[in-house]
Amino acid sequence: MVINLSDQYSLLSNWVSELRSIQVQTDRMRFRRNLERIGEVAAFEISKVLEFEEKEIQTPLGISVCKVLKEQPVLATILRAGLPLHQGLLNYFDRADNAFISAYRKHNRDGSFEISLDYVSCPELEDRVVVIADPMLATGSSLVKTIQFLREEGHPKEIHIVVAIACTVGIEFVQRTEPNVKIWCGAIDEELTAKGYIVPGLGDAGDLAYGTKVQF
């Protein structure tokens, strides 16, 4: 299931436009904050499909029966680019357990790349709802590898993926390999280059958020 959050008019479209803009995206603090805002919107929308329960709450004047989230999800992010988006999710799911995954493109001299997964830290995942934050869904390779690794650690009952910008090629790849996940997108682009970059996209989200990295 794919949900394009830009299908309806909202402030989210403004934030996506600023992420894309070469005039605005050079402001790193603003870039990170816009990713964080998209994470907040996604958290609110995801909360609508999670399980709630009624709970009696004592007020100064009596008892109120309130609907509260039955269980906090596990929030997972792919380092480093996913951190601002993850923070947006965490602002709303503020008592959630967290998982961190180091998955990145290890580039070869010929321009090709492999997905390297070097580090994972995660809580118990068995029968939990997992929300994975990754700002760009391009080929989908790193996301699928991350999901497969998390499944080895436990068996989540639901997996949600939150991305700022996705490519249709990557969406289709994830849906073929992980048909039961829900993908929440800030925007969807059609083109993917031979080197695995989304067009028009926004560039390298990790570099824009935290500075240019050195390839080892």
For the regions a language model picked out, list residue spans one by one:
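PRPP-associated nucleotide enzymes
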Residues: M1-F216
